[in-house]
Amino acid sequence: MVREILEVLEKCPLAQYALGKDLVRVLPPTPHGFEVIIEQIWENHYSVTYGGWHEDFYSLEEALGCFSLGLTDHCRLKVCSKDGNPFRWTVEYWDDPHWRKRSTKATWSHRIFAPEVTAYMQNDLLPEIDVQPMLNKLVAPHCSRV
């Protein structure tokens, strides 16, 4: 798994990353970016994390596609916070001419009456790849939710 990830990161000369036992963590390139992590949970089970959002995959190819997409400007993370505490993360992808929702992860917030603040985080580390094949594979299972 690490070899395949390093092949992707070779195309990202500005990427700062750390290797762990079974994971690779790419740091946000700017204060407006988000961390991207790919982790092998066990054989044929992978998790990809963007900030507070995550998804499990049972194919390395799909996990690598999601990991790579998070490094591009065709993906953004919508982060909702209350009193400076993030509680909902939505992954959106660019489907010209609109941003489309892929999926959302959330935690409970006891700050019920606090106003919600939305921020959009985006990376631009892997700009010159053809993202359409990745989008087709990653979005197809979620079409009913889009």
Name each model-derived stretch.
Residues 1-13:
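Amphipathic alpha-helical segments
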Residues 46-50, 91:
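Short, hydrophobic/proline-enriched secondary-structure or compact coil segments at domain edges
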Residues 72-146:
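Acidic, proline/glycine-rich low-complexity IDRs
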Residues 31, 40-46, 71-74, 96:
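Short, solvent-exposed coil/turn segments at beta-strand boundaries
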Residues 49-59:
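A short, exposed loop/beta-hairpin motif centered on an aromatic-Gly-Thr core
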Residues 14-44:
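Amphipathic, interaction-prone secondary-structure segments
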Residues 59-71:
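A short, charged, amphipathic alpha-helix used as a generic interaction element across diverse proteins
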Residues 2, 60-63, 131:
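Short amphipathic alpha-helical segments that mediate assembly, nucleic-acid/protein binding
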